[in-house]
Amino acid sequence: MSLKIGRNDPCWCGSGKKYKKCHEAFDEKMEIMKQKGYAVIDHDLIKTPEQIAKIKESCKINIAVLDYVEEHIKPGVSTEEIDRWVHEETVRHGGIPAPLNYEGFPKSVCTSVNEVVCHGIPDEEQILKEGDIINVDVSTIYNGYYSDSSRMFCIGKAVSYTHLTLPTIA
């Protein structure tokens, strides 16, 4: 059975407006695009104000965890130690580290040091040293809502990288 929203029903987006005054014209255009073979996003990708508020709660944990990392990161720290910090702080704030065991990923955070572009796996043997740059990518599940953010850190004194030849992407 197909459920169709009525023109005078509340809009599916949660705005409180009638469907005909909110998303009806948009949905009609999307249906035409779908019939022409274009990929069209589902309504569940568009979040209600209540869902956005819950996502923001998850984001607050990410920010707190990254702030903790910023306070403690220094030369001599292993990326495995960063993983422990992230795991413990995320759980302490009531969250779940989203990367842990996702499609076999073995850690609670991604740590990408220097030339590693993204999704580096923390390791006890990877010790941060003066001049390294590291991206710490934190993803949190809180009350069923996901958030993802990262921060780049310069370890020790900032170093000029102008002497390096960086790859060019065409």
Segments predicted by a language model, with ranges:
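Conserved small/polar residues in nucleotide/adenosyl-binding loops
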Residues: 162-168
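Acidic/histidine-enriched ion/cofactor-binding microenvironments in catalytic or ligand-binding pockets
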Residues: 47, 112-145
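Extended boundary segments
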Residues: 68-101
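Acidic/negatively charged segments and metal-coordination signatures
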Residues: 1-45
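Short, compositionally biased
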Residues: 147-161
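Short, basic/aromatic beta-hairpin or loop at an interaction surface
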Residues: 102-115
